[in-house]
Amino acid sequence: MLRFAPSPTGDMHIGNLRAAIFNYIIAKQQNQKFLIRIEDTDIARNIVDKDKEILNLLNLFGLLWDNLVYQSSNFERHRQLAQHLISKDLAFYCYCSKEFLESKRLEAKEQKKPFRYDPSWAEIEKSSNTKPVVRIRGASEAISFEDAIKGTLRFEAHEIDSFVILKEDGIPTYNFACAIDDMLYDISFIVRGEDHVSNTPRQILIHRALGYDKVLGYAHLPIILGESGSKMSKRDNASSVAWLLEEGFLPQAIMNYLISMGNHTPTEVFKLQDAYNWFDIKNIAKSPVKFDIKRLRFLNREHLKMLNEQEFALLLDSKDSSIGALGKLHLQEASTLNEIRSKIERIFSPKCIAQNEEGENFENECKILYDILHQMIESYDESLNDYDTFKNALMAKSSLKGKKFFKPLRILLTGQTQGLELSEIYPYLRFFLRDIVRLSK
């Protein structure tokens, strides 16, 4: 079984989603089940309904799970196993206060040594009112594991001291809950961010202490950098999956991009299901990869092109395939649904005919064309059915030509002074002329 284990303490970012996608693909390739484990052990930081938001996003991306568990439902089992380790002298109570430990950290810093917990401190403050935590005994030998991306990773015994597995309130720490739940659900392979590399030997230590000898596979993904080259932070809008969706990027385009980041793919544009045939986690680059919004925009445009007109219309909140066709036409100059919606909204909004951004004024010409168009629409003039016939009839009736004809006509039809060729767009606009040709008051 493979798993994706999000925490309901914040928004899902693209690094989380990338890990979820890779775990899901590998589960499909190996015909294994896919587990979602909500890691809600940090009770103070859990955000109400954030778990539902995460699950809705996973569902939207088509990452359908076979099992769903909440880590908190296993708290009693975690406590039982902590007591088991204590009974075997593989874990112990520690009564050290936060102040005592902080003083030891400062000592180590002054001596320019790495801080390492000393088990002999455990009962120094036992007579005080300090509630004890439970610590697992540190490693007695080096711990190594194979990483599908980074190769063999080795941690010396002195790097893995006696760390906390149960807090003073009896809540398990992240590493303890994670290690036990991976055992309980028979997880075989874990794909996660490289910020978890230092957690892996600790989780292996817990497995060994509990007599769990299954060797898990690991792949730690390199971080994603912002366009500036620095690590992406929560302040980077593009790091948020919700923001990308709100901007009008399709789930299938986002997945396409995240799978191809730092990877060799047989084609530029593909769907999630295509990746089942060729994806190999070992091909993911070891070094950090820079987020490229231009690349994502390109892929989004390509995935929008793959939609039929009815599908496109539904994404634009319309049931009329002509609106979908209009949207597809705008892919010549737009890449996201928001950009296309904006252009179509301008078409159907009352038109402002005052001076435009270039300082040009076609107010008189717009009024002349508006009056003629209004008459043609009301009389169901047959010349409206074909662009060339329509253009010639309107030009003859208005006595306007050149720039003084085409720019005001474009303003009346699209609300803009530049854009697609009117001959391309008119076949789709003609069905809506009564709604389109309106002036703002």
Curated annotation (Swiss-Prot):
The record's EC number reads 6.1.1.17
Motif mapping: 'KMSKS' region: 231-235
The top EC class, named as a word, is ligase
Q: What is its main location?
A: cytoplasm
**Which UniProt keywords are given for this protein, alphabetically ordered?**
Aminoacyl-tRNA synthetase, ATP-binding, Cytoplasm, Ligase, Nucleotide-binding, Protein biosynthesis
| GO terms for cellular component | cytosol
Family statement: Belongs to the class-I aminoacyl-tRNA synthetase family. Glutamate--tRNA ligase type 1 subfamily.
Q: What is this protein called?
A: Glutamate--tRNA ligase 2
Provenance organism: Helicobacter hepaticus (strain ATCC 51449 / 3B1)
* GN (gene name): gltX2
